[in-house]
Amino acid sequence: MSIKVFSGNRMIDTKAGKVIEKDISILVKDSEIISVDSPEKISSHEMFQNAEKIKLNGTILPGLVDCHVHLIGFGDGTPGDVLVKTDDNLLAINGAQNAIRHLDSGVTTLRDLGAKNMTGYMIKEASNRGIIQTP
């Protein structure tokens, strides 16, 4: 069982449609959000004492979803006819790096809509084995 408390001072509340500009904490058990409240109220929760405390910088927001990506792309306008001639290993490594970029920008779910040969499956398998992090 994993218990974490994420704390910050700015959060986007998509349900209310507003930005909360005050100290806020989020109590999470495994992958379920248990409570979102003031740090004072969260610290009085019975799970707080055993929780890993994580201080966040920047804005806390719900995970973003990108429904159309091609992870193996270089992002520099390299045309498809060049990508098909590029070594699969290089494309897979580039795809892993692009997955990290997505995570760093707040994307927690994505759908890769096409990759050369088995490179997309290589990235997925590496993620499933815990070798790389992906959304």
For the regions a language model picked out, list residue spans one by one:
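N-terminal metal-binding scaffold of metallo-dependent hydrolase/deaminase domains
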Residues: 1-47, 60
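Conserved beta-strand scaffold positions in the cores of enzyme catalytic domains, especially
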Residues: 5, 50-55
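Surface-exposed loop/turn positions
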Residues: 24, 51-52, 107
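Residues at the C-termini of beta-strands that transition into short coil/loop
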Residues: 37, 55-57, 75
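Metal-associated gating/positioning segment near the N- to mid-region
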Residues: 59-126
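Alpha-helix-loop-beta-strand connector modules within alpha/beta enzyme cores
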Residues: 125-135
